[in-house]
């Protein structure tokens, strides 16, 4: 008996059911992790806005007090005495107000776009997990209705299975592209720091627009089909070009940027060895945390890539790999939340210089 005919390549219905349940469990963890990341980001934005508002009010009060103090000196001492002392007082007030209004009003501290990019990635992770839970629960509870078309006479086939698969496809692809955008952004900020006016707009077009176009194509061309197990999957020709190829390219680009980012970080901060070993340790820690987003993406999707490679040469559904795939693939949102939490801890306890603010805060 060949390996393709063995039990390891032909899981039973009960084993497929266990995979579905495992998928729901890991997706639930990812859903909670993504939700916590989203809530944390929004809360930080609201808190920062309140602090900035309070600072502006305090600055205005100090400016008003400074103006009243100048007026009282002028009225109390007369114009001749004000000319001798008021010049010094005016200079003092001017310096005080300048220290308040100048730096805070004109100098804009460098801030990282990384939290916003992680927020967008978390939105994609959240909805991916949400619709996976709905899809798998529907399949377990009513497999017949799950794959039954709404209207067989329509040229374009629609069923709960097809619609949910298209939505999951969209959000999964979005996580691919957002992670790739994050890897590019991190490398760009280290290699040639500076604001790019349309960078976020480009990221949004790439990470939402391309997945939407791909999902529409596979839906409108009836490329989402129901297999013998009741699952919906993309037909082989489309799966290769519109699922596996984007995934493989994103993994490749992220891997390239990961190694380039590590090499660039080491070369850029190598001089700190001669200044302070603690600073080098902090920079090394920051580097590891930042690149973890890329590493998690690669690890979570590597089993899926291997499974696709196997399917090109064999009909074997390698069950151990299928289990690993259903543990890692839906759990990306959970691991991203874990990295986000650690990154924020490092940002909180790291000396607040321009380099760290541009990369983390």
Swiss-Prot record:
Entry keyword Transmembrane: yes
GO cellular component: plasma membrane
Assigned protein family: Belongs to the G-protein coupled receptor 5 family.
Keyword annotations from UniProtKB, A to Z: G-protein coupled receptor, Membrane, Receptor, Transducer, Transmembrane, Transmembrane helix
GO biological process: adenylate cyclase-activating G protein-coupled receptor signaling pathway
Protein name: Cyclic AMP receptor-like protein C
Pfam families, per the entry: Dicty_CAR
Keyword Transferase recorded: no
Positions on the Extracellular side per record topology: 1-18, 135-166, 219-238, 314-318
Cytoplasmic topological domain: 40-113, 188-197, 260-292, 340-361
Membrane topology, as annotated: Multi-pass membrane protein
Transmembrane regions listed in the UniProt entry: 19-39, 114-134, 167-187, 198-218, 239-259, 293-313, 319-339
């Amino acid at each position: 008996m060949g390996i393709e005919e063995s039990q390891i390549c032909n899981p039973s219905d009960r084993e497929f059911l266990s995979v579905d349940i495992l998928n729901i469990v890991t997706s639930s963890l990812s859903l909670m992790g993504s939700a916590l990341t989203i809530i944390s980001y929004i809360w930080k934005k609201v808190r920062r806005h309140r602090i900035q508002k309070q600072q502006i009010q305090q600055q205005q009060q100090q400016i008003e007090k400074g103006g009243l103090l100048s007026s009282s000196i002028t009225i109390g001492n007369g114009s001749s005495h004000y000319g001798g002392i008021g010049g010094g007082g005016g200079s003092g007030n001017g310096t005080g107000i300048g220290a308040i209004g100048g730096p805070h009003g004109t100098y804009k501290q460098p801030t990282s776009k990384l939290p916003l990019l992680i927020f967008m990635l978390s939105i994609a992770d959240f909805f991916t997990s949400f619709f996976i839970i709905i899809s798998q629960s529907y399949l377990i509870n009513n497999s017949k209705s799950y794959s039954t078309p709404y209207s067989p006479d329509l040229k374009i086939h629609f069923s709960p299975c097809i619609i949910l698969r298209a939505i999951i496809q969209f959000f999964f692809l979005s996580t691919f592209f957002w992670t790739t955008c994050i890897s590019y952004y991190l490398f760009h900020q280290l290699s040639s720091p500076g604001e790019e006016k349309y960078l976020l707009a480009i990221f949004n077009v790439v990470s939402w627009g391309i997945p939407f176009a791909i999902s529409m194509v596979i839906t409108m061309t009836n490329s989402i089909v129901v297999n013998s197990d009741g699952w919906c999957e993309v037909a082989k020709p489309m799966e290769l070009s519109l699922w596996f190829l984007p995934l493989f390219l994103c993994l490749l680009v992220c891997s390239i940027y990961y190694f380039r980012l590590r090499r660039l970080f080491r070369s850029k901060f190598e001089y700190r060895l001669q200044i302070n070993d603690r600073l080098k340790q902090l920079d090394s820690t920051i580097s590891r945390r930042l690149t973890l987003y890329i590493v998690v993406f690669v690890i979570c999707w590597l089993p899926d890539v291997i499974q696709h490679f196997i399917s090109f040469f064999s009909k074997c559904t390698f069950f151990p790999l299928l289990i690993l795939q259903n543990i890692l693939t839906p759990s990306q949102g959970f691991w991203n939340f874990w990295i986000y939490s650690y990154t924020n801890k490092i940002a909180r306890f790291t000396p607040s210089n321009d380099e760290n603010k541009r990369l983390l805060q």
